[in-house]
Amino acid sequence: MFNFKKTSIFQHKEEIEVPQYSFEDFPRESHVLAVWGSPGCGKTVTATKLAQYLASRKKDVAIIYCDMMTPMLHCVCPPSELEELHSLGSILSAAHPSPPLIKANVVCHRRNSHLVMLGLKKSENLYSYPAFDEQIAEEFIDNVRELAPYVILDCSSYIAFDILSAVSLMKADTVLRMVSCDLKGVSYLASQLPLLNGEQWNSDKHIRIAGNLQKYQAVDNLAQAMGGLSYQIPHAEEVEQQFLSGNLYKDLTAKQSRVFQKMIIQIAEEVFDV
């Protein structure tokens, strides 16, 4: 395990000599990716698998599960594989979400030293902590950017009510706009995209993705409705089973998952240049 920055959240548990890497070994600046889209399109699965892929490449990555209605930490990873659980709410309810406060509240993965997570704990909700505003959300994302070279924000679908997810779309360097291949997905975007009018959203630069794509679904019609698709992430039975069992950080081994994994790798290469 190593540190990209002196203020990195990835710290050694005991004092050992840290190898000196050349400047070219790591990104010149942190890159923040927001993953957003319609309900059921595979946002959390995609965000988690991207984080897992980066960590498997020994890239230090922080993933933030922004959903304030459905805490996701216990839905993506067995509690036994996580070190001491902390809550994102403890950070956002502070007067200032400072780097030391963030570092003290990250959740570490026992099996992967290049991965940390943030999110609400099981049974918590938006009202479990004092309310926070846009300024706090912006300061939080800025400080996470200073601590980790790769940051993934798993946004909720309900950006009109979720301040952190909405601010994530504004502050991210790249946004994956995902949609399920059905009328509900198309209707969702038709309803929500007008909220993203304005230069601060950069919605014209979103990477458009069809997620959780079933073989029988008419992706051509969806592509036309969305103005084109950059990626088509297929449904994978193995991924679904991992999601149902709350173990999305488990490696994919089934032959049928190869196309899914290929899409994850291609997205990681485009977004993070790894």
Predicted regions and their residues:
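Inter-motif core of Ras-like GTPase G domains
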Residues: 146, 162-182
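Cytosolic-facing regulatory segments adjacent to core modules
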Residues: 99-112, 116-159
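Conserved lysine of the Walker
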Residues: 43
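NTP-binding/hydrolysis catalytic cores, primarily Walker-type P-loop NTPases
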Residues: 245-274
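Hydrophobic positions on the alpha1 helix immediately C-terminal to the Walker A/P-loop
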Residues: 46, 50
